[in-house]
């Protein structure tokens, strides 16, 4: 998993509340267990017209936001079913940070396991960031995970809070497998001592 230390990029505004995982990645795209290629299905029902052509009114289809790395979204983002394809689709599109006032718990935790930083902010701060994100190609935010700080296009900044363990995992690019490998030497030491103490079980 790629490390997340500092991210600077275009932030796309999505001022919609209760965006569920079916909206993020419709069920038609759940037939694969590959993490790549799902970016085309991200918000598919909103991004595409019935004939499959791009819906030019949807924010991620607008030229200024086609390479967005950050999503500023309404309250309760990622609610609904627990499909891990939702963060996979966001990541495959190129989005590595989602900012909202709240997230569904399962989606929130799945983000960290896939290298995405979900940031919780107050409604006041979200309104400010949503306004910043509405500046089109000038909607540049910098997310500094080391200092827990968001800097806007005007140079103003705001702080956010994050569980220290989750912060450690993102800063070091550690998913569940990576965390286990961090303890590889301790695991190996235990296995050897346990085998010596219980040779009949070896």
Curated annotation (Swiss-Prot):
InterPro entries reported for this sequence: 3-IsopropMal_deHydase_ssu, Aconitase/3IPM_dehydase_swvl, AconitaseA/IPMdHydase_ssu_swvl, IPMI_Swivel, LeuD
Reactions listed under catalytic activity: (2R,3S)-3-isopropylmalate = (2S)-2-isopropylmalate
Molecular function (Gene Ontology), one example: 3-isopropylmalate dehydratase activity
Keywords, sorted A to Z: Amino-acid biosynthesis, Branched-chain amino acid biosynthesis, Leucine biosynthesis, Lyase
Entry's EC annotation: 4.2.1.33
Residue ranges of coiled coil: none
Pathway as given in its UniProt record: Amino-acid biosynthesis; L-leucine biosynthesis; L-leucine from 3-methyl-2-oxobutanoate: step 2/4
One cellular component (GO) term of this entry: 3-isopropylmalate dehydratase complex
One GO-annotated biological process of the protein: L-leucine biosynthetic process
Keyword Repressor: no
Subunit structure: Heterodimer of LeuC and LeuD.
Family per record: Belongs to the LeuD family. LeuD type 1 subfamily.
Summary of the function given for this chain in its UniProt record: Catalyzes the isomerization between 2-isopropylmalate and 3-isopropylmalate, via the formation of 2-isopropylmaleate.
Protein name: 3-isopropylmalate dehydratase small subunit
The organism of origin for this protein: Rhizobium rhizogenes (strain K84 / ATCC BAA-868) (Agrobacterium radiobacter)
Gene, per the UniProt record: leuD
